[in-house]
């Protein structure tokens, strides 16, 4: 009834005149109302609205960070994780190890006829974790030597013990009835040589290294009566002599010997009498101090068997506790949710394992297995972290830019995308320590520097980068000195100069490393301005300080000063930017806002010039202001002689000044720490002995023209490298002697010639006198000698250069103490600094020949230049080798424990024997570091592709990776990455993920595109260059100021090309003739096709434009990185974690290197867990509640269960649908039939009536 009423009213409305319009309006109002209602509903649920439609809220927090992000680009996080306690994983590890052993067994069978014994497994390296535990130069022999063996008899029994200084017996702590022998040595090198010599022999005795400790609670210790530990002194003491001079009188009188161990902050004392310990212990209680610090004396205990108390770095047993997971991933995810909530999704790459606490129902987290990302599934299973990392960019659905983390890496402070990448400066690259040297004694800066270095002349260093190929390379060690080069203040055994010498202010310190925001040890020297402030301001007093004043713009640097720095503390709060005039005297200039200083490092020996600076500062009100200053500099410095002696001789035409001895300062560096290593030869051996060459001393100006011309020719041949120095001396001596024999001018002969024999007799009264002088560092050897008043001629006798007048009578084996003062003149004021007295060997005194360059034998140059230093006026700091400590070995636990390292070392040795088919006794074997070897391997590949340069290793921290860049890298080196993917365990020929990625990003070059240059110049985008645009192009390819010839020359090139090139290339016919008009009517329309195909113009453009980096990047320091290697020393771990608490960093890595079998392992893990809970106590959305855990811990189990669940769900739905349909048909059969008849009515068929039939 109601339906009929509604139907009648509808028809009435539609039949009305305006009914149709009213209905249309009603429909529109209804639709608008519906949209408005929907909008209100969405506003009520604003957070869900933004999650669905706002890209700024597409992150794990579901909040908008629009005011903090530079762009709404989605950024995902990728983790690599493994559960080391999984039994299935441990079984697979054991299988891989057995497979490697079988392969090596087969290799030994091949070598059976040439191998006397299999290669020994690497010895376990034990680490002492006791308090103040130090390794001392002692060897412990078990069982003890016979009681009648004395120190003199010891070398006859063990020849390697010839350097032993003492021997005594002690009783075993656990078995006092038996003794062990303790052999004492003077140095670490002696004890290591003796230890290795004893291991090579067939001794039946077990040999141990000796340790001393103050921890008396550990069993197996022996108290040393005459030894004691001194602690509590300030940590600033780094040298033994420094501490010895500060000891109180009552303490030093009872000490026979003292040895400082600065790394452990203790000193070992050898007492005169064992009873002195009690007296000293009482005296320390009376507040005996050094610099306000109270001293503590502790007894010293000897131990040698570390197996019960130490951490094994190379344990061979597999156990679940060894690779135990400390749930670092849980806390790393908490750090992301707290400090980086802008992350979109999180992907966890595993070998199929699932964390028991992970909430798999969270849509923001996804487990990715190796099968999902590896292209070649035959490479699986893999246990190599580089192999896994090389495939993570192939994760499906991953953002273009993603952040890669290991589970032991977390965020300590708020982190934003611009900490990794910014549009203005590009990728931010965090670098740490340098790449290990390619060979022993060959720093990276030596490769391809124009000199052939013996240490680098091997395949590992690519034959010195080509310097040793042919005769193009010169010698780094030139006996006669560098005629054209200058001696910098680098290492005293290396002459400066060479092709790229200006790129390095010190050996191993490139100019690009200065002011790079982290302290480089090689740059922390005076010649580099102490790394331009990166290493702190402790040494700023050694630099020349200039204070910038608000009303002063002109400053004058004293002559000879090349390392000034400017303090702007009185002018501004911080520096914003700065620019300086292009001047060849400048090596480096930078602003250090931390110290409010401007550092200027200049090349020495340069003429006077003026440098202009344009600086932008910020005052205390954060207002920017500009400041222009001019600085007058002159880095030349004249010689400063301590004493000279001049004596005129009758026979000389010109006076001769005695060559002063240069003031030489040495640092007392132990011989075993000196670098590089070189082999010494006996100077009296027949191989090194050379025939004495006597060159007459002549006044060149008195010689005939033909003789002078011949000498000049010899000088040119030597300078060009056509002859060696030895050949030069022989030729010059023969030429002068032949002239003397044939000369009829006796007067000239008597006046101009003094032979070496007469020279010796003349200086006999002054043989014992030593003359000292300070020559400027910045001058070359030849330049320094030019300032003296005599012609210098150098001769070589028995491999040593001898000065001709007068030879200093110093024995080559003498050792003496040099007490010197360093004088530094600044603006007329002389300041003196007295360094500690040093014991140095002086084996020969040599003088350099003026303007002599050449190449000499490798053995001679290595020894002479390593031992003979002249003109070095600064005390060079002890060179610390570029090394890496606590390096990152991989995210997999078996890589941290070096589980496969022994097998890899043995495989390397066997492969070497197979390659050369030699006897294993003659095959030297050296344990290798796989991680360091792989860095060298990648560095060698990068050198071959992008050129030789010094590189550093990226920090172990989160890295932002671009999928496109990573794919380009792998497309460039497909074989290398495929080999990396093939390796089952970490290998020395792996492509290191971060190292290869970032150096490809920093080295990739974008080839110059002429079309882009044309588009830049074509400012009106007309496709044809106008006169004004042609002038712009001319300024880009010519030096300023632009001359008329430059402009007309460019136009003539274009005119000639338009006449020579075909019309279909220049496309001049397609250009309207009135589009551009030129001053020169002969100039055709300058189109893009004309410019790009005109070779003279393109050559000019290529010459003016340099290839640009394909990707922008910025080198960052280590200020925001905290890398801690967690070991089993509880007190050390607590100190490390407290340092992070006090100084939070953005990027924190706690690398687990805990020995889980150690007695203190559970304590360390508890301390670590407490630290995690204190930093991140709030559970993240990715965790299950504490009372729940995942049912499945492997993806294959989960996938099987999901497949079974889906199948069961499908059949359940089918059955349910069948039941519903059956129920409907059973109860509503009549209604369904009626509905069917109503929807599909049956049509009735009416038959026609028969025509013959008559209706009645």
From Swiss-Prot:
E.C. number: 2.7.8.17
Keyword Transcription: no
DMAP1-binding domain mapped to chain residues: 699-798
Record text on subunit structure and interactions: Hexamer of two alpha, two beta and two gamma (GNPTG) subunits; disulfide-linked. The alpha and/or the beta subunits of the enzyme constitute the catalytic subunits. Interacts with LYSET; facilitates proper localization of GNPTAB.
Main function: Catalyzes the formation of mannose 6-phosphate (M6P) markers on high mannose type oligosaccharides in the Golgi apparatus. M6P residues are required to bind to the M6P receptors (MPR), which mediate the vesicular transport of lysosomal enzymes to the endosomal/prelysosomal compartment.
Disease: Mucolipidosis type II: Fatal, autosomal recessive, lysosomal storage disorder characterized by severe clinical and radiologic features, peculiar fibroblast inclusions, and no excessive mucopolysacchariduria. Congenital dislocation of the hip, thoracic deformities, hernia, and hyperplastic gums are evident soon after birth.
Name of the featured protein: N-acetylglucosamine-1-phosphotransferase subunits alpha/beta
Name of the coding gene: GNPTAB
């Amino acid at each position: 009834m109601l339906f009929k009423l509604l139907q009648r009213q509808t028809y009435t409305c539609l039949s009305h005149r305006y009914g149709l319009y009213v209905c249309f309006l009603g429909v529109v109002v209804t639709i608008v109302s519906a949209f408005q209602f929907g909008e209100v509903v969405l506003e009520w649920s604003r957070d869900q609205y933004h999650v669905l439609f706002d890209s700024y809220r597409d992150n794990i927090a579901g909040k908008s960070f629009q005011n903090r992000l530079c762009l709404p680009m989605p950024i995902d996080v990728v983790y690599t994780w493994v559960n080391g306690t999984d039994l299935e994983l441990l079984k697979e590890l054991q299988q891989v190890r057995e497979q490697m052993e079988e392969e090596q067994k087969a290799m030994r069978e091949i070598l059976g006829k040439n191998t006397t014994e299999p290669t020994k497994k690497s010895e376990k390296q034990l680490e002492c974790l006791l308090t103040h535990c130090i390794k001392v130069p002692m060897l412990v022999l078990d069982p003890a030597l016979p009681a009648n063996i004395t120190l003199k008899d010891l070398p006859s029994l063990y020849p390697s013990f010839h350097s032993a200084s003492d021997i005594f017996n002690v009783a075993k702590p656990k078995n006092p009835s038996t003794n062990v022998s303790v052999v004492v040595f003077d140095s670490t090198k002696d004890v290591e040589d003796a230890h290795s010599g004893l291991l090579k022999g067939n001794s039946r005795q077990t040999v141990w290294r000796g340790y001393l400790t103050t921890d008396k609670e550990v069993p197996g210790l022996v108290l040393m009566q005459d030894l004691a530990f001194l602690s509590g002194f300030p940590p600033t003491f780094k040298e033994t002599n420094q501490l010895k001079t500060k000891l109180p009188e009552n303490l030093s009188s009872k000490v026979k010997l003292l040895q400082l161990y600065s790394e452990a902050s203790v000193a070992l004392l050898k007492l005169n009498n064992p009873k002195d310990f009690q007296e000293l212990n009482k005296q320390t209680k009376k507040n005996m101090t050094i610099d306000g610090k109270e001293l503590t004396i502790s007894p010293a205990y000897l131990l040698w068997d570390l197996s019960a108390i130490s951490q094994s770095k190379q344990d061979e047993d597999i156990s679940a506790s060894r690779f135990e997971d400390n749930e670092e991933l849980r806390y790393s995810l908490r750090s992301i949710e707290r400090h980086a909530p802008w992350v979109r999704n999180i992907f966890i790459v595993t070998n199929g394992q699932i964390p028991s606490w992970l909430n798999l129902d969270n849509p923001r987290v996804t487990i990715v297995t190796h099968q999902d990302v590896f292209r070649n599934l035959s490479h699986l299973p893999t246990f190599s972290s580089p192999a896994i990392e090389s495939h993570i960019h192939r994760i499906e659905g991953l953002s273009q830019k993603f952040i890669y983390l290991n589970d032991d890496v977390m965020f300590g402070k708020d982190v934003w995308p611009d900490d990794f990448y910014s549009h203005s400066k590009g990728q931010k690259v965090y670098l740490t320590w340098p790449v290990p040297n390619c060979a022993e004694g060959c720093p990276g800066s030596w490769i391809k520097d124009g000199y052939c270095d013996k240490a680098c002349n091997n395949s590992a260093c690519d034959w010195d980068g080509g310097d040793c190929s042919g005769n193009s390379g010169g010698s780094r060690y030139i006996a006669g000195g560098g005629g054209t080069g200058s001696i910098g203040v680098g290492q005293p055994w290396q002459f400066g100069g060479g092709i790229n010498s200006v790129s390095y202010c010190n050996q191993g310190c490139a100019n690009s490393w200065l002011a790079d925001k982290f302290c480089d040890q090689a740059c922390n020297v005076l010649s580099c301005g102490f790394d331009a402030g990166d290493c702190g301001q402790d040494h700023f007093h050694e630099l020349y300080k200039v204070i910038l004043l608000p009303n002063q713009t002109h400053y004058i640097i004293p002559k000879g000063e090349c390392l000034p720095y400017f303090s702007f503390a009185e002018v501004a709060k911080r520096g914003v930017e700065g620019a300086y005039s292009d001047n060849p005297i400048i090596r480096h200039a930078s602003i250090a806002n931390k110290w409010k200083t401007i550092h200027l490092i200049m090349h020495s020996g340069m003429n006077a010039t003026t440098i202009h600076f344009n600086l932008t500062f910020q005052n205390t009100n954060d207002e920017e202001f500009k400041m222009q200053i001019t600085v007058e500099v002159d880095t030349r410095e004249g010689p400063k002689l301590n004493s000279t002696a001049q004596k005129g001789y009758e026979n000389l035409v010109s006076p001769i000044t005695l060559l002063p001895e240069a003031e030489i300062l040495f640092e007392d560096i132990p011989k075993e720490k000196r670098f590089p290593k070189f082999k010494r030869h006996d100077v009296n051996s027949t191989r090194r002995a050379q025939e004495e060459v006597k060159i007459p001393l002549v006044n060149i100006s008195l010689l005939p023209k033909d003789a002078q011309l011949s000498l000049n020719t010899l000088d040119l041949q030597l300078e060009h490298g056509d002859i060696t120095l030895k050949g030069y001396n022989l030729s010059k001596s023969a030429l002068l002697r032949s002239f003397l024999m044939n000369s009829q001018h006796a007067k000239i002969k008597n006046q101009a010639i003094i032979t070496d024999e007469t020279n010796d007799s003349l200086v006999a009264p002054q043989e014992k006198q030593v003359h000292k002088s300070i020559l400027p560092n910045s001058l070359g050897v030849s330049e320094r000698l030019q300032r003296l008043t005599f012609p210098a001629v150098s001769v070589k006798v028995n491999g040593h250069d001898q000065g001709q007048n007068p030879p200093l009578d110093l024995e080559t084996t003498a050792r003496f103490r040099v007490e010197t003062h360093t004088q530094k003149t600044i603006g007329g004021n002389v300041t003196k600094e007295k360094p500690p007295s040093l014991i140095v060997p002086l084996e020969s005194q040599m003088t350099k020949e003026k303007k002599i360059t050449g190449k000499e034998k490798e053995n001679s140059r290595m020894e002479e230049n390593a031992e003979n230093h002249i003109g070095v006026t600064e005390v060079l700091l002890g060179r610390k080798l570029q090394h890496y400590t606590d390096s990152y070995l991989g995210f997999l636990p078996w890589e941290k424990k070096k589980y496969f390292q022994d097998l890899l070392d043995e495989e390397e040795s066997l492969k070497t024997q197979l390659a050369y088919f030699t006897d294993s006794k003659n095959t030297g074997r050296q344990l290798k570091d796989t991680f360091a070897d792989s860095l060298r391997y990648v560095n060698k590949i990068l050198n071959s592709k992008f050129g030789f340069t010094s590189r550093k290793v990226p920090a172990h921290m989160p890295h932002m990776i671009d999928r496109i860049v990573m794919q380009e890298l792998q497309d460039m080196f497909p074989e290398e990455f495929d080999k990396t993917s093939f390796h089952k365990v970490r290998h020395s020929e792996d492509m290191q993920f971060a190292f290869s990625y970032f150096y490809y990003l920093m080295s990739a070059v974008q080839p110059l595109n002429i079309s882009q240059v044309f588009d830049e110049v074509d400012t009106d985008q007309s496709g044809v260059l106008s006169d004004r645009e042609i002038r712009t192009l001319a300024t880009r390819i010519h030096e300023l100021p632009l001359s008329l010839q430059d402009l007309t020359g460019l136009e003539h090139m274009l005119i000639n090309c338009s006449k020579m090139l075909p019309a279909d290339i220049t496309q001049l016919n397609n250009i309207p003739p009135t589009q551009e008009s030129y001053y020169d009517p002969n100039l055709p329309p300058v189109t893009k096709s004309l410019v790009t195909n005109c070779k003279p113009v393109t050559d000019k453009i290529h010459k003016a434009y340099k290839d640009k980096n394909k990707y922008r990047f910025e080198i960052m320091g280590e200020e925001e990185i905290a890398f801690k290697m967690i070991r089993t020393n509880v007190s050390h771990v607590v100190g490390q974690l407290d340092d992070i608490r006090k100084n939070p960093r953005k990027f924190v890595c706690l690398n687990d290197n805990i020995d889980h079998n150690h007695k203190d392992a559970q304590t360390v893990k508890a301390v670590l867990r407490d630290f995690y809970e204190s930093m991140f106590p709030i559970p993240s959305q990715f965790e299950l509640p504490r009372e729940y855990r995942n049912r499945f811990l492997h993806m294959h189990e989960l996938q099987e269960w999901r497949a079974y669940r889906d199948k069961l769900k499908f059949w359940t739905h089918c059955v349910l649908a069948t039941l519903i349909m059956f129920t409907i048909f059973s109860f509503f059969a009549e209604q369904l039939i009626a509905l069917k008849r109503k929807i599909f009515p049956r049509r009735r068929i009416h038959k026609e009536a028969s025509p013959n039939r008559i209706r009645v």
